[in-house]
From Swiss-Prot:
CTP binds at G8, R11, R91, R137, R140. Residues 228-329 form the HD domain. Monomer. Can also form homodimers and oligomers. Comprises two domains: an N-terminal domain containing the nucleotidyltransferase activity and a C-terminal HD domain associated with both phosphodiesterase and phosphatase activities. CDD domains: HDc (cd00077), NT_ClassII-CCAase (cd05398). GO terms for molecular function: ATP binding; CCA tRNA nucleotidyltransferase activity; cyclic-nucleotide phosphodiesterase activity; magnesium ion binding; phosphatase activity; tRNA binding. This is Multifunctional CCA protein. Pfam families: HD, PolyA_pol, PolyA_pol_RNAbd. Mg(2+) binds at E21, D23. ATP binds at G8, R11, R91, R137, R140. A single active site specifically recognizes both ATP and CTP and is responsible for their addition. Its cofactor is Mg(2+); Ni(2+). Disulfide bonds: none annotated.
Length: 414
């Protein structure tokens, strides 16, 4: 019986990245042998065990054979006669198919180290095409390692395109699609995930609301990049520099979905695209079972992001309506989330990446003024019921009106 460190831990150590978890493969052993040593079995479909002390995962070496549809349609064979090479052969990418022995010796039968040096994501074998989840995994690894210069091998790209065309992606459950997407949104370059999916045809299958933005023009004066799909990915890339939050990044991804509904005769203008996009956000989130808090922010950003661009022109009552709509009184964190997505929208344009976004500070200051009106004083004045709400609104409007007189005019987005 021999144990080997495998997968991400070996890959990340070779890339000089922090290793967060370790997975092991055990060659030449039976479940009974591991159980006798105190390991706890946790895998139902294939034999995976938890180490009695470290609680790290140890899996018996196994092979997999396609026996049905989708990413669950596999028959596993785990036995003492399965070799390390056979176990590594079933893995998705060569960079994930390297093992290290307890003595530190590397086993790399599929040239993963060479692909790490070349910064290439390459599938190990044609069995890659049997698991549709791997299309998403490759896109996620491309996003995760883009800053290191990794790209997808052309032959892997071709195989992913064939998989997208075959209809196999429809076997993926919404939960798995969202889980991979959520992981991708947390990476340093989340826009690469969606670009890789688009390059192989998977974006049209899994995210048609985003796919249809490509080829939709916006006015060149405001959008030198012209294409709304390109602008969407630029906005997501900019958001990744401003916030690590999945909610904010997903909202940025969805902010212009409504432009996909604009009839061609109205191009390149998209009047009312914000409210129109709310329904598409709802549709996308319902299909992928996106968590409610993530969905709620994305809907608000779709509806109000353009309003924030013109915040200094808003009347006091309109500012208060905006604060009410985003529920900032009870959820003050929403203010920063809305500002970050609007800033990313403004800066996610060719030639505007380094521009300041004074609308953010203006909106923060406006909220401080409105929130500074004392609710206790209104209640203490003896008013009852709805009269309290109306008086609070009146005082907030008055405070904002007086404050606005002292503010410099912000030039519009240019």
């Amino acid at each position: 019986m021999k144990t080997y460190l495998v997968g991400g831990a070996v890959r990340d150590s070779l890339l000089n990245l922090p290793v967060t978890e370790q997975d092991w493969v055990v060659v030449g052993a039976t479940p009974e042998q591991l159980l006798a040593q105190g390991y706890q079995q946790v895998g139902k479909d294939f034999p995976v065990f938890l180490h009695p002390v470290t609680h790290e995962e140890y899996a018996l070496a196994r092979t997999e054979r396609k026996s049905g549809q989708g990413y669950t349609g596999f028959t596993c064979y785990a036995a003492p006669d399965v070799t390390l090479e056979e176990d590594l052969l079933r893995r998705d990418l060569t960079i994930n198919a390297i093992a290290r022995s307890s003595e530190g010796e590397l086993f790399d039968p599929y040239n993963g180290q060479q692909d790490i040096e070349k910064r290439v994501l390459r599938h190990v074998s044609d069995a890659f095409g049997e698991d549709p989840l791997r299309v998403l995994r490759v896109a996620r690894f491309a996003a995760r390692f883009a800053h290191l210069g990794f790209t997808v091998a052309s032959e892997t790209q071709s195989l992913m395109a064939a998989m997208a065309k075959s209809g196999e992606l429809s076997a993926l459950t919404p939960e798995r699609v969202w889980k991979e997407t959520e992981k991708a949104l947390k990476t340093q370059s989340p826009q690469i995930y969606f670009q890789v999916l688009r390059d192989c045809g998977a974006l049209a299958v899994l995210f048609p609301e985003i796919e249809c933005l490509f080829g939709v023009p916006a006015p060149e004066k405001w959008h030198p990049e012209i294409d709304t799909g390109i602008h969407t990915l630029m906005t997501l890339a900019m958001t990744a520099q401003l916030s690590p939050e999945v909610d904010v990044r997903f909202a940025a991804l969805c902010h212009d979905l409504g432009k996909g509904l604009t009839p061609k005769e109205f191009w390149p203008h998209h009047h009312g695209h914000g409210p129109a996009g709310v329904k598409l956000v709802e549709q996308l989130c319902q299909r992928l079972r996106v968590p409610n808090p993530v969905r709620d922010l994305a809907k608000l950003v779709a509806e109000y992001h353009d309003l924030i661009h013109t915040v200094n022109k808003l009347r006091p009552e309109t500012l208060l309506k905006l604060f009410d709509a985003i529920d900032v009184w009870r959820k003050p964190e929403r203010l920063e989330q809305m500002i970050m997505t609007s800033e990313a929208d403004a800066r996610g344009r060719t030639g505007f990446e380094e521009n300041p976004y004074p609308q953010g500070d203006y909106l923060r200051a406006a909220f401080r003024i409105a929130n500074g009106v004392s609710v206790q004083e209104v209640v203490a004045s003896g008013l009852q019921g709805l009269a309290i709400r109306d008086e609070l609104k009146r005082r907030r409007q008055q405070a904002l009106a007086e404050w606005k007189l002292t503010q410099e005019v912000i030039s519009p987005l240019n």
